[in-house]
């Protein structure tokens, strides 16, 4: 009975609810419940859609899985870079240890000549030369002939002026050893035969090294990289030790001076030594040749070190194919400049006159004071002019529209380092001269000229370095020259003609030169004038110390102040660097001229 009553009550409630839903004017209470049910059913679908979108976004941001080939190739590249760094580190440590060992021998010879003699140092250097010589021959005969050994060449390495200087100084060093052999043979009664052996080994080493560096200085070796790096560093360390020995060893100079003193005593009838040359004329030629060519040996060692370092950096290097497709620099054409070459030629002519007069006077027993005055007066006139030209060029660089070349360039970085490092040679001599003059006799005319020369030399080096480095970091204008114009000019073949046509062609060429000069931008024109003027001035200042004019050592002021051996080491350290600086400056100024 109770269950039936509950069922009837439920039916009655359902009936009332249905009547309320259909009666007009009443609020529908059941509709929200239906909507809530629909929203409840749609909520899982929305959550599913949100989860799918989040998964898609996560999949888009998640790094893609690389294929096995890409991962394997990346691993090989990383291993190759690590192996290259390890090879560079090991070869650098090898060179460092060889230099320290040789430096210890040379310092021991200087400070304790009884325990370590010059012969011991020569034995060590001869061993290093033989090892380097064997590696050079192996490199040419085996390494470079292997398949895919040299696939690329660095177009910026080994420019023509570097290779030309290498051959020039190598030839002078070879002749220096010939003079040394002749001098030793003429004194064979009191000379060790080992000296002849050492000179012959050095001649063979210089000849082979010059030939290999001339031929292979641009190589980017891809096989036997570690062995090649070690061989290059061993050869570099050998050249560096030869330079250190040439700077510090004054035994040959002292021997020549002692022999000249003996000859003077013999002429007065007080002969005390029988170890004299039998042929006086030949010995005089050997002595003069040795003293004149001695600075070239140090310059040769420095250039070899620079070339070997570039080759060491290029081992295992991959050069992009487009780097060798076009020339690294524009062809050199002398146009757009008139006054700079004229002033430079005047400086060159005056420098040749001073050089000839000084050399003629130096052939006598003593050099008169007026020739030192003439030499330093020439420098005091030229150096401030060069400094002003460099400062003007640096200011014009700041006004130019050309962009800075910010692309990483190892060759340009090495050029800047060599330029700054080579400038330390002459600047060091200048600072030592300033101290000696101020401490002794600053009131004499010659000493005042030397003081002014030293100060102006320091200023000129600083100004010229600023000008060259600023020019090297500017983007060259020849890179943006339209190729169609160049192709159009090159497309016209040369043709023969009569003398009348030749004269008309020369007239047109001169008119075109004047036209191009008048239509050049004034900034470009000024840079071309300054660059050509500085090129000729640096050639003049390179020629005078390179071919035997060394007033820094002959005037006697600094030699008396510091002592013979110390001043000998200072001059032989600074003069070769100074000659190398002038040469390197000419190369940098040519690039600045071409870039303008």
UniProtKB/Swiss-Prot annotation:
Stretches assigned to the Cytoplasmic side? 1-88, 144-159, 218-225, 313-338, 396-413, 470-529, 590-596
What's the source species for this entry? Homo sapiens (Human)
Q: Where is the composition biased (Basic and acidic residues)?
A: 43-59
Q: What is reported on the regulation of this protein's activity?
A: Activated by extracellular acidification. Activated by Zn(2+) under non-acidic conditions.
Extracellular-facing ranges: 110-119, 182-193, 249-295, 359-372, 436-446, 548-566
Transmembrane domains' residue ranges: 89-109, 120-143, 160-181, 194-217, 226-248, 296-312, 339-358, 373-395, 414-435, 447-469, 530-547, 567-589
This protein's major location comes to membrane
Q: What is this protein called?
A: Proton channel OTOP3
Task: State the InterPro entries in the record.
Answer: Otopetrin, Znf_C2H2_type
Q: Where is the composition biased (Low complexity)?
A: 1-21
GO CC entries? membrane; plasma membrane
Please give the function described in this protein's UniProt entry: Proton-selective channel gated by extracellular protons.
| Disordered: annotated span | 1-59
Q: Could you tell me what reaction this enzyme catalyses?
A: H(+)(in) = H(+)(out)
What does the sequence similarity comment in the record state about its family? Belongs to the otopetrin family.
Q: Name one GO molecular function term.
A: proton channel activity
Q: How does it sit in the membrane?
A: Multi-pass membrane protein
Q: Which residues carry this modification: Phosphoserine?
A: 21, 23
Which residues are the signal sequence here?
Answer: none
Q: Which GO terms describe its biological process?
A: proton transmembrane transport
Q: How does it assemble?
A: Homodimer.
UniProt xrefs under PANTHER family: PROTON CHANNEL OTOP, PROTON CHANNEL OTOP3
Compartment(s): Cell membrane
């Amino acid at each position: 009975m109770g269950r039936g009553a509950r069922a009837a009550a439920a039916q009655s409630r359902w009936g009332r609810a249905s009547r309320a839903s259909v009666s007009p004017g009443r609020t529908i209470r059941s509709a929200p419940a239906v909507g809530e049910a629909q929203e409840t059913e749609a909520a899982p679908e929305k959550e599913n859609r949100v989860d799918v979108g989040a998964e898609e976004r996560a999949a888009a941001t998640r790094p893609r899985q690389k294929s096995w080939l890409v991962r394997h190739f990346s691993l090989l590249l990383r291993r190759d870079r690590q192996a290259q760094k390890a090879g560079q580190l090991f070869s650098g440590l090898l060179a460092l240890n060889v230099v320290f060992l040789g430096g210890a021998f040379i310092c021991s010879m200087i400070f304790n000549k009884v325990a370590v003699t010059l012969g011991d140092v020569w034995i060590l250097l001869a061993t290093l030369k033989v090892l380097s010589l064997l590696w050079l021959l192996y490199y040419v005969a085996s390494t470079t002939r292997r398949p895919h050994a040299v696939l690329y060449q660095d177009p910026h390495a080994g420019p023509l002026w570097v290779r030309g200087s290498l051959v020039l100084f190598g030839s002078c060093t070879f002749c220096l050893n010939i003079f040394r052999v002749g001098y030793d043979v003429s004194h064979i009664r009191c000379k060790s035969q080992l000296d002849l052996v050492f000179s012959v080994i050095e001649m063979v080493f210089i000849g082979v090294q010059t030939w290999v560096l001339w031929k292979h200085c641009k190589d980017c070796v891809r096989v036997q990289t570690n062995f090649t790096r070690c061989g290059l560093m061993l050869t570099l360390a050998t050249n560096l030790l030869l330079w250190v020995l040439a700077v510090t060893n004054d035994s040959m100079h002292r021997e020549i001076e002692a022999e000249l003193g003996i000859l003077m005593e013999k002429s007065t009838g007080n002969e005390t030594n029988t170890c004299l040359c039998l042929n006086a004329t030949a010995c005089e030629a050997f002595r003069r040749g040795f003293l004149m060519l001695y600075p070239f040996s140090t310059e040769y060692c420095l250039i070899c070190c620079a070339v070997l370092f570039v080759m060491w950096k290029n081992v295992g290097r991959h050069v992009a194919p487009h780097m060798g497709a076009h020339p690294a620099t524009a062809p050199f054409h002398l146009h757009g400049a008139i006054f700079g070459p004229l002033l430079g030629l005047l400086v060159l002519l005056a420098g040749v006159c001073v050089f000839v007069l000084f050399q003629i006077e130096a052939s006598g027993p003593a050099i008169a004071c007026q020739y030192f005055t003439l030499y330093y007066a020439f420098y005091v006139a030229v150096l401030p002019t060069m400094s002003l030209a460099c400062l003007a060029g640096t200011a014009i660089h700041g006004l130019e529209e050309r962009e800075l070349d910010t692309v990483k360039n190892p060759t340009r970085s090495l050029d800047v380092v060599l330029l700054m490092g080579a400038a330390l040679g002459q600047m060091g001599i200048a600072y030592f001269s300033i101290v000696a003059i101020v401490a002794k006799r600053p009131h004499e005319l010659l000493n005042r000229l030397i003081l002014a020369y030293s100060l102006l030399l320091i200023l000129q080096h600083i100004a010229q370095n600023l000008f060259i480095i600023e020019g090297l970091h500017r983007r060259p204008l020849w890179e943006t020259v339209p190729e169609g114009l160049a192709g159009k000019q090159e497309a016209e073949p040369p043709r023969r003609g009569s003398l009348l046509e030749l004269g008309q062609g020369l007239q047109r060429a001169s008119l075109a030169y004047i036209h191009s000069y008048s239509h050049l931008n004034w900034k470009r024109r000024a840079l071309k004038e300054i660059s050509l003027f500085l090129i000729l001035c640096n050639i003049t200042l390179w020629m005078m110390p390179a071919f035997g004019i060394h007033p820094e050592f002959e005037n006697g002021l600094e030699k008396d102040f510091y002592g013979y051996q110390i001043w000998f080491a200072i001059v032989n350290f600074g003069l070769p660097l100074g000659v190398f600086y002038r040469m390197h400056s000419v190369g940098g100024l040519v690039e600045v001229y071409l870039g303008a």
